[in-house]
């Protein structure tokens, strides 16, 4: 509690001055042997896509599945004996929960994680598997956060904030040290922004080691709290957030992280939901890597970079995503790319019509993956049926060729998606 009180008495300028590259190097020592050094992966596909030489930093392959372990472990490892005996607490429904639980277990410290009661059971079980006591409360993160503060006050736990903490952001900054050590002539680093702790640490470390390297933050359009804060000149709050990048679904950045990002970031790029989903699909197809929505933000921003021919490190921040969610995101990305096409046609209710449609599709190399033959959907004619067909396609041009071929065969095509 003394540390929190002391920090509250300091100005933002004093906090900025009191957090340096030395803290990041100290964090690297603390993390040695605890985190994996996730080696860069050169990506010919993403390089060709954006006209730069792209290297992936796969923190989705990190212990616990994200970068969050770096900050959590660095923070908890520097608690004194009395603080560790008291135990630690936080609120999270995602990667921070697992990072804190993993770090606390490794350091023989009790951890309590407050999660919304609506948290998917797989995430709850994963957090418990690292030894944490999980408290399920409320329907939202805000409810769980309020509960964690109540328990902290009642039990005397040490709070481990997910982003607005100097030791946490110093731990996250070790990611940048690894990038620069492996790719010494890197020109730019792309880093996702949620609450801003990751971007703060990466930017601080990068600019201290090589001020010429550009550090570009990436936010989802539906949760661009840091961009809004930059535009308004102070920490600002979004009225709501809506994004598939749930790890970055933050309404308000931290005051510390706002100050660090304002000082060290060169630019913020925002990306759409479809750009995020398309990046996820490309990562799976081209690199056989799975990321969560927030993990794909850097890749989604590659086409928006204001330069060409540079060496760019894109950080894949995490890969904790459940199977049903990744399946839904892949389906939407395939539809957006014209790789899946669903349509309906009305047919006379007589033999041979389905064969006729199937022959047209076969001639156009369209692979049928779903078909529904329904008599009840036609209300204006007793002698007609509706045929709904979903096919695999090769892109938007292929879809148009299929539509034209069906129309030439006498069918009226209604595109569903």
Language-model segments: residues:
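PLP-dependent amino-acid enzyme catalytic core
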Residues: 2-417
